[in-house]
Amino acid sequence: MNDQHLQDLIHHAYANSPAFRVRLDGAGISPDTIQTTADLNRIPVLTKDEAVALQAADPPFGGMLAAPLSAVSRIFFSPGPLYEPGPEEDDAAWEVAVKLLREAGFSAGEIILNSLSYHLVPAGYLFDGAFTRLGATVIPAGTGPADLQLKMAHDLGATGYVGTPSFLLSLLQKAEEQGITLSIRRAVTTAEPLPPAMRQVLAGQYGLEVINTYATAELGALAFNTGDGMAMRLLPEPLIQVVNPDSGQPVGPGETGEVVVTTGNRLYPLIRFGTGDLAMNIDPRPGESAQAERAVILVGRRGEAVKVRGMFLHPNQLRFAAAQVPGVQAMQAIITRPDGLRDHFALRVAAAEGADEAAIAEGLKAAVQGVCRVRVDEVGFGEVAQEEPPVVDKRKWD
């Protein structure tokens, strides 16, 4: 989103969206002062909980709609509850989605099995529209019976798939059991995590090219991953920031923050909308990278994280770090503040029998420092029960 587009969007939203106008006025911000992306950081982040509260107080859209209700063709639902107008035919989001599919290797003439839901939520509709605009033929299977989807995929010669990775794997396994040969060679997965082990099965055992997509009901597709590793490359649109959840200011490379998005949708402009997702910010050329050069590593939800020495720490980051060190069977982080001033960050580790504890301790210190950007003060060994929480915060704040 260039500066002129951003300026036009801010003025349009201020003039036509009562909720956005109240938000800016409440923060003492004039729309004329938002000239660049850097200026955008002055606007408070709108959390999903706040959006839900706005809609509850002023249904159906909480004053966030910037056009008459008659301009809305479709209304979708996401948990909260939160109502979202679907993208209109001229929405720029379609072009971005089509570019993603082309970059992933899809082309006109393909037949796509769409196993995402078409009911209430936008996922099925969004990918349906993107594939048809690409020139593909879509089988709108939705959440229909697996046996019927398998038959349709076989009979119609489906070459591509979009849906959850777990359902794709179950279809492939079912086809294998029944001696059915499928023509699916490429898949877009979304709506749930894609563990490395499952990707390996899909790619190695079944020979599929897998494009894992980060998308939300409110915002559509935001990032994607086409190979090994956890980094997901950002799409060029909408405008995506990774910010400190407390201050709302952008975090540096390698730091973890909340994914915050500004859409260019003039019908329903979501400006500085907080997804609640925490991610590590990957920026190869800080301050110079185009958005499409940047990436994120999703680590979890905001409510599950704790802050240690100014850095947000999520249990999934610790799990990832522990998985890099041989001999670690279980691990728990314990955060204390013994002197009332400085955080003490310790790890309690259950090691495999006969494992080199000294090597594990050094390996974990390096892995956690690299993944979480937090220095480990102490590593101890002992039992760690499976039911115990991965992070224990013993700090006293009174």
Please identify what each model-predicted range represents.
Residues 35, 47, 112-113, 139, ...:
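Hydrophobic/aromatic beta-strand patches that form the interior of the parallel beta-sheet core
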Residues 3-14, 18-22, 134-398:
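Active-site glycine/GP-rich loop and adjacent strand/helix microenvironment
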Residues 102-136:
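Conserved AMP-binding loop of ANL adenylate-forming enzymes
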